[in-house]
Regions:
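Residues on the lipid-exposed face of transmembrane beta-strands in outer-membrane beta-barrel proteins
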Residues: 23, 35, 71-75, 85, ...
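Short sequence motifs at beta-strands and strand-loop junctions characteristic
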Residues: 60-66, 106-111, 169-176, 228-232, ...
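Cleavable N-terminal export/targeting peptides
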Residues: 1-15
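Outer membrane beta-barrel transmembrane domains
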Residues: 46-57, 200, 205-340
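Short loop/turn motifs that connect adjacent beta-strands in outer-membrane beta-barrel proteins
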Residues: 2-6, 21-30, 44, 80, ...
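Surface-exposed strand-loop-strand hairpins of Gram-negative outer-membrane beta-barrel proteins
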Residues: 5, 39-68, 167
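Outer-membrane pore/translocation modules
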Residues: 91-229
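Outer-membrane beta-barrel architecture
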Residues: 26-34, 82-87, 110-112, 127-135, ...
Length: 340
C-alpha cells in the first residue's frame, strides 16, 4: 500500500471491490481471480514534512525497491456475500551506505496471507445507483518477519548476517484484524463516485526482531527502539470514475497511513510512522470476463511523524528526536481480474 520506509505492507484491501453488484445481477456461485503487481522506489528522505535534500545530493540516501504481487481468490456466493483469500509475494531490496561504501540487502518470499468476508448492505435489486460493502478479515503472520541478509561494514570490509530493515521484511509478525468499507454511487450510467476505507489492527506489541546487527545502546533499550514494532495501518481512498465504451477512467485521492499509536494494545518498538497523501489516476479496460487496470498514485504530501520511541527519547534526554523515512514519488499498480 505505501511508498517507502513507512512500511505499510500489501494487503489486497484495495482490490476487494472488483465488480459492482448491479453488474452481476443474477450471477451466483462464481469466482474472481485478481493479480495485482505493485512497484515503487523510495529514495527521498523526510523528517516530518521537510525533505532532507542533502541526502540525495550527497548520495548517502537509502534506496528501497519493492515489487509485490498480490494473488486474490474471491468466491462470490450470491449478490451480497463473498469471501476473499489474498496471498502476497514480495521481492525487495534496500541500498544503503556504510563508511562511504554502498551495499544492498534483499528479501524474497510470501508475505502475510489474509482471509476476508464481504457483504453488500443494500439489496442490489432495489439499490440500483449505489451501494456500500463492508468486510472483516484476519491477517495471519505467514510472512517472515526476521528475514536475514549480510550487512557490509564499509570501513573494514567485514560482512555480518542480520535481520533486514523493517521496510523490506516480508511480514510484521502479528495476527491482525481488518475492516473494509467500499462504496460507490452512480449519477448516470457512465459517471459516478467511489470510496474505500481499510484498517488493519495489529494487537501484538513487538515481534522481537532486532533493529541493529550490533548490541543496542542503553537509550535504545530504554525507549524500546531495539526491536521492531507490529504497527496498525490504514488506507482512505475516494474519487470519480467515467466509463467510455470498454474503458473506465478514474481520478481520486488516497491517504496511506501507518499511525504513531495502535488502536489496541501498546505501541512499543521501532516503527517509522507517517502518511502519504497522493493523487491517483487510473484506467481499466474490460473485455468479456477479463479486466485489465493500471493505477499510479503520485505523492503530494509525505510526512514522517514522530514515533513513540522518538517521543520517549526526547523526554529522556531533553534533546528533540525525530527520525526520518524514505518515500517514493509514485507507485505503479497494474493488474488483471478474471471472472470464472
Amino acid at each position: 500500500m505505501a511508498q517507502g520506509c513507512v512500511a505499510i505492507r500489501s494487503t489486497g484491501g484495495i482490490c476487494a471491490m472488483d465488480e459492482h453488484p448491479d453488474s452481476t445481477s443474477g450471477s451466483k456461485g462464481y469466482w474472481l481471480y485478481n493479480n495485482n503487481d505493485r512497484y515503487y522506489k523510495s529514495f527521498r528522505h523526510f523528517v516530518g514534512k521537510a525533505e532532507q535534500y542533502e541526502r540525495t545530493a550527497l548520495h548517502n540516501n537509502v534506496i528501497n525497491k519493492v515489487v509485490t504481487q498480490d494473488n486474490s481468490f474471491t468466491r462470490v456466493f450470491d449478490e451480497r456475500w463473498s469471501l476473499t483469500l489474498d496471498v502476497p509475494f514480495a521481492d525487495n531490496s534496500r541500498s544503503q551506505v556504510s563508511s562511504g561504501t554502498r551495499f544492498a540487502t534483499h528479501s524474497f518470499g510470501v508475505g502475510d496471507i489474509s482471509v476476508s468476508g464481504f457483504y453488500w448492505l443494500f439489496n442490489p435489486a432495489t439499490s440500483k445507483n449505489g451501494n456500500i460493502q463492508v468486510g472483516m478479515g484476519v491477517k495471519f503472520a505467514t510472512g517472515n518477519y526476521d528475514y536475514q541478509d549480510y550487512f557490509l561494514n564499509g570501513a573494514t570490509g567485514a560482512r555480518t548476517l542480520g535481520a533486514v530493515d523493517q521496510s523490506i521484511q516480508l511480514g510484521d509478525g502479528g495476527t491482525g484484524v481488518s475492516l473494509d468499507v467500499n462504496a460507490y454511487y452512480n449519477f448516470t450510467r457512465t459517471f459516478g463516485f467511489y470510496g474505500n476505507f481499510f484498517y488493519l489492527a495489529n494487537p501484538r506489541d513487538v515481534n522481537g526482531t532486532p533493529t541493529s546487527t550490533t548490541a543496542p545502546s542503553a537509550t535504545k533499550l530504554a525507549v524500546t527502539s531495539d526491536v521492531e514494532s507490529v504497527p496498525d495501518q490504514y488506507l482512505i481512498r475516494f474519487g470519480a470514475s467515467l466509463a467510455v465504451n470498454k474503458f473506465d477512467f478514474s481520478l481520486g485521492m488516497r491517504d496511506d497511513c501507518l499511525p504513531v499509536r495502535d488502536l489496541f494494545g501498546n505501541s512499543d518498538g521501532f516503527r517509522r510512522p507517517g502518511y502519504i497523501i497522493a493523487a491517483e489516476p487510473g484506467i481499466t479496460y474490460r473485455f468479456g470476463n477479463i479486466a485489465l487496470y493500471a493505477y499510479v498514485p503520485i505523492a503530494i504530501i509525505r510526512d514522517r511523524t514522530q514515533s513513540v520511541p522518538d517521543i520517549r527519547q526526547t523526554a529522556l534526554t531533553g534533546v528533540y528526536t525525530h527520525g526520518d523515512a524514505a518515500f517514493a514519488d509514485y507507485v505503479v499498480n497494474v493488474g488483471v481480474t478474471v471472472k470464472f
